[in-house]
Amino acid sequence: MTLFSSISSMSTSMSGSKSSIASFGSGTSMGSNSIACGGGCGGSGGILGSGLGLGLGLDLTGGSRSRGACGNGGNRGNGNGGMGGGNGSCCGGPCCGI
């Protein structure tokens, strides 16, 4: 769970951002002014499985097909950690309530 610890601290440091969110495969979320989207679309979901993304468009899914919590702009969850839009769409619907 070292990876999760580092992600948690990163999320905490970004909590001042309006769109900061950590989304999990179960659909629960931590953050403000946001709508969770089950951790992604097309992946197995869950922290260890594939689906943790941060609301700033960061893709931390490690190469899975799931998308980040907030749509990830043009990156579409290829695991490269690219920055995308913070208010994109997820599974065809709105994913960030900002």
Curated annotation (Swiss-Prot):
Family membership noted in the UniProt record: Belongs to the hssA/B family.
Pfam families membership: Coiled
InterPro entries: HssA/B-like_chaperone, HssA/B-related
Record-given protein name: HssA/B-like protein 39
Region Disordered, annotated ranges: 1-21
Name of the gene this protein is made from: hssl39
Superkingdom of origin: Eukaryota
Biological process terms in GO annotation: sorocarp development
Residues spanning the signal sequence: none
Organism: Dictyostelium discoideum (Social amoeba)
